[in-house]
Every structure is written in structure tokens, then in C-alpha cells.
Regions:
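Active-site SXXK
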Residues: 60-84, 108, 232
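Short, well-structured active-site flanking segments
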Residues: 77-92, 177-181
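Structured C-terminal helix/loop/strand segments within mature extracytoplasmic catalytic/sensor domains
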Residues: 21-29, 33, 122-127, 174-198, ...
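Acidic helix-start/capping segments at beta-turn-to-alpha-helix junctions
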Residues: 86-101, 105-110, 124-125
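Beta-lactamase-like hydrolase cores
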Residues: 18-62
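Bacterial N-terminal signal peptides
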Residues: 6-15
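Positively charged n-region of N-terminal signal peptides that target proteins for export
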Residues: 1-4
Length: 263
């Protein structure tokens, strides 16, 4: 119910806003970078919103590693990991060098370490995922068919609009998790922090390592600055490895334009 209500409120705010029409600045950024994708940018109160490619913004897609945001809270709630626990690397060399070592929750989140979160998923189990995803209203809440990969290549889907609605509930601490879990997640989500602003975010890349699958890049999070909180969700088609950096670049360019990031 919460998920549907949050999406309804966000959609209503967008429809009532003059920003619902294709935003010229956002469209220009995507066009200049030759990117097919979408971006939703919304203030906490939902009154001020900017969008690019409204149809794609409402299209549910695999969340990939952006699911590490709720997954971290679910793992802490299930007590399968603690803040200072370390999981031992199994010695298998994987494609990302930062994954080839022992991992803590913070290092695994920041490096987007797949094997670490898959190990947590084995401990969490399908039944707990099913109940937790329904309880927090994340996307379509379908954790199948495999409990260790449903966010990478399974049935779970979420749209950019739903990502923003979920992040707002996360920020307001409306989800059923302990304060200590919220505080830990807030800390490990920090990408950049200055006296003027704090940026918390997570990347994702659905289809990574599988060229037969659709390649979908994500960047979701929120920016706290000058008494305001801006929430964003970008997804885009990834056509080449160099596109990975465009996820962050596009969002940062938009934040500089719309959120007065450096004022």
C-alpha cells in the first residue's frame, strides 16, 4: 500500500508541475552525450520536479546493484552481518579487482561487490526476501527465481519513479528498520561530503558481464544541500564500457544546474 501511495503522490506532483513536460536542459544533456535513458529529480516535498523521458521513467527495470540499498537494511535486520564483520574472499579472481579481497559491509557496498551480497542472500533466504520486499514495497517485490541473483537477472523490477519514492521513504525513516541500521547505511552511502553538501548514492549495471542481456546502467541517491534534499534516479542504455562514467556525470551535471549544488 505504501509503495502505491508513494508512487501516486509522486506522479500527481509531477503531473501538477510545469516540469512534467520534457525539461530542455535535461534533454540537452542526454542528447549531447548520445545517451538513451531517463532521469527523475525531485525535492523532498515533491513540489519541484524535473524529468527526462517520462515513459522510460515509469518503466520497471532490473535494479542491479542499486538493490544494495534495501538489501543492506534487510541483511542487518536479519542479523546475517554486522557493521565490523568481515567475509573472507574465496580466492576466485573476478572481473573487478576490488572484489578480490576480504570484504566488510562498507567495502562491499562501495565497490559493489557481488559475491559478498550473494553470500548474505544465501543466509537471508527466499522466504525472508519475499516478506521483506512486500513489507517495504520495493518495486514489484518479486524476489525470484533465485534468491542470490533476483536483483541482477531475475524477476525483481523497479522504475526510476519508484526508486525516487523509495529513497524518500528511506530518508524519512518510514521503513521498518532500526535506527542503527539507517545510520550505518547513511554512512556507507556517502559518495562525497563537503561543508556545502553531502551526496549519497549507489550505481548499478544490469547485464554486466553478459553481453546477451540488455545493458542497463543506474545511478540513484540524494543530495543534501542548503537546507534542501534532492532525490534522483537515472537509468540508461549502456552501449560500451566507457558509458559507466556517464551515469554519475549526467546526474552531477543536472544537480549543478537544478539543485544549485555549488552555491
Amino acid at each position: 500500500m505504501w509503495r502505491h501511495l508513494s508512487i501516486f503522490i509522486l506522479l500527481f506532483a509531477l503531473s501538477a508541475s510545469s516540469a512534467l513536460a520534457e525539461d530542455a536542459q535535461l534533454a540537452a544533456l542526454f542528447r549531447e552525450n548520445n545517451v538513451n535513458g531517463t532521469l527523475v529529480l525531485s525535492l523532498l516535498d515533491g513540489v519541484t520536479n524535473y524529468t527526462h523521458n517520462d515513459a522510460r521513467a515509469a518503466t520497471p527495470l532490473l535494479p542491479a546493484s542499486t538493490f544494495k540499498i534495501p538489501n543492506t537494511l534487510i541483511a542487518l535486520d536479519a542479523a546475517v552481518i554486522k557493521e565490523n564483520d568481515t567475509l573472507k574472499w574465496d580466492g576466485t579472481n573476478r572481473s573487478v579487482a576490488a572484489w578480490n579481497k576480504d570484504q566488510t559491509l562498507e567495502s562491499a557496498f562501495k565497490s559493489s561487490c557481488v559475491w559478498f551480497y550473494q553470500e548474505l542472500a544465501r543466509c537471508i533466504g527466499a522466504a525472508r526476501y519475499e516478506s521483506q520486499l512486500a513489507r517495504i514495497g520495493y518495486g514489484n517485490a518479486k524476489p525470484g527465481p533465485e534468491p542470490t541473483s533476483f536483483w541482477l537477472e531475475g524477476d525483481l523490477r523497479i522504475s526510476a519513479l519508484e526508486q525516487v519514492a523509495f529513497l524518500k521513504r528511506l530518508y524519512r525513516r518510514e521503513l521498518p528498520f532500526k535506527s542503527s541500521s539507517y545510520e550505518l547505511l547513511q554512512r556507507i552511502m556517502i559518495v562525497e561530503q563537503t561543508p556545502a553538501y553531502t551526496l549519497r548514492a549507489k550505481t548499478g549495471w544490469a547485464g554486466y558481464g553478459n553481453q546477451a542481456a540488455p545493458q542497463i546502467g543506474w545511478y540513484v541517491g540524494y543530495l543534501e544541500t542548503n537546507g534542501n534534499v534532492w532525490f534522483f534516479a537515472l537509468n540508461m542504455e549502456m552501449t560500451k564500457p566507457a558509458d559507466a562514467g556517464l551515469r554519475q556525470k549526467l546526474v552531477m551535471d543536472v544537480l549543478k544546474q537544478k539543485a544549485s549544488m555549488y552555491r
